[in-house]
Amino acid sequence: MAEIKPAEISAILRKQVEGFESGATLEEVGTVLQVGDGIARVYGLSNVQYGELVEFDNGMEGIVLNLEEDNVGVVLLGPSTGIKEGSTAKRTQRIASLKVGEQMVGRVVNTLGFPIDGKGPIGGDLYEMPLERKAPGVIFRQPVTEPLQTGVKAVDAMIPVGRGQRELVIGDRQTGKSTVCIDTILNQKEFYDAGKPVFCIYVAIGQKASTVAGIAKMLEEKGAMAYTVIVAANASDPAPMQVYAPFAGAAIGEYFRDSGRPALIVYDDLSKQAVAYREVSLLLRRPPGREAYPGDVFYLHSRLLERACKVIADDGIAKNMNDLPESIKPIVKGGGSLTALPIIETQAGDVSAYIPTNVISITDGQIFLDGDLFNSGVRPAINVGISVSRVGGNAQIKSMKKVSGTLKLDQAQFRELEAFAKFGSDLDSVTLNVIEKGKRNVEILKQGLNDPYTVENQVAIIYAGSKNLLRNVPVEKVKEFEADFLAYLNSKHKDTLNALKAGKLDDSITDVIEKAAKEISAKYN
């Protein structure tokens, strides 16, 4: 048996003691005073910051939204089961963030960036992006000059949207607001196939889970999930998750924007986010304002929508952008853009309510969808009179700008005369001509569900309409004429369409279009 040497043992013990480090870490811990309705009041976190994440003893996290004299109000990011009076809550010294990466594309995630589509965890390189972030300053932006093709004829012709713009889609329920935005996402497939993808983020706020599943399935079938991320905070999710879902979507969009690529984000819809924010604010006992919304509901939407912009093309300047997250600094490039299409639901067409007027004043224009037009069969039901794009005109391609120049005015004139014509039948030939042309243009601007048009097809058919080349085609045959006309151009004159796509519109091109229209319209005489 080996002899035990005390000197060796004491040397080993001394070595162990010298290498020992105290594992005690200081944590600031508070106690839950009250919990319920997704809100916890915590006592003892005297140094906690506004917007900081707090972790409860069951692993649940919450965001500090109220700092009061003797306690803090924390909104819970999940169910409150397992948190009770007397539970502990500790500071994390982090703000709410989510991990974003290339492999997030094609997935359905929740507000915290965790996948909820049952396809396993998100792999690849992930970058931490904060939910709340300051919008880029004026120095880091440039004007909107590139078009974002929506594939919707009425929008691309009369209310054009540019990359980096915020264009509000507003209307009553069931007037096709989501459809306009989803068609825009579907239309980006053309750019994805050409190797210049516009990454799309669809944020579903307070919708039924079945509706979101239906949208995801449809995008999958049409091949659009290859460049789309869906962020879902369903109707059954806690109000804080619905409030922060748009911020999560914006953070994902900023990842693409700041790495020099174009992105498009749809917020469907911000009315539900405002309602969820009102619920959270009232539970936190903040004083209510107009329509019981809190005083900072304008700021909620403005700080979200200001994050959509066109970033300056200079990489050197872009790398110094204000409030850049540390994680993405190595991959920052200039020239990216984030285009926002927020949706707002109105009650009985009242655009002058609180939330609609707020968002109208924040955005760069609005597309107003009219229930009466929708019910009369004009779909998309865009009311051209009060729809406007404040910056998109500079982003239209030249050929579209030329053909659609008078279209908006013509249609407004037609609507006015149409109402007048109901009272009298003896109209002069000029008025009759305006009405007949207007009726055909209304038919041209109609479009099927999930059926976006390429820009060259749009320019060709709108040229035919604005030059009154369809005057001999009966109104009920216009859609038939359109299908024949575009099929003829696509099979016989592909080069003409390619020239239109490149923005050219000269006499040789218009001659081809006019001859084709004459030839096809002869069938309908």
From Swiss-Prot:
Major site of localization recorded for this protein: membrane
Record has 4Fe-4S as a keyword: no
Record's function text: Produces ATP from ADP in the presence of a proton gradient across the membrane. The alpha chain is a regulatory subunit.
SUPFAM superfamilies: C-terminal domain of alpha and beta subunits of F1 ATP synthase, N-terminal domain of alpha and beta subunits of F1 ATP synthase, P-loop containing nucleoside triphosphate hydrolases
Substrates-to-products reaction catalysed: ATP + H2O + 4 H(+)(in) = ADP + phosphate + 5 H(+)(out)
Site (Required for activity) location in chain: S387
Top-level taxonomic group: Bacteria
Family the UniProt entry places it in: Belongs to the ATPase alpha/beta chains family.
Membrane topology: Peripheral membrane protein
Protein name: ATP synthase subunit alpha
Organism: Flavobacterium johnsoniae (strain ATCC 17061 / DSM 2064 / JCM 8514 / BCRC 14874 / CCUG 350202 / NBRC 14942 / NCIMB 11054 / UW101)
Keywords associated with the record: ATP synthesis, ATP-binding, Cell inner membrane, Cell membrane, CF(1), Hydrogen ion transport, Ion transport, Membrane, Nucleotide-binding, Translocase, Transport
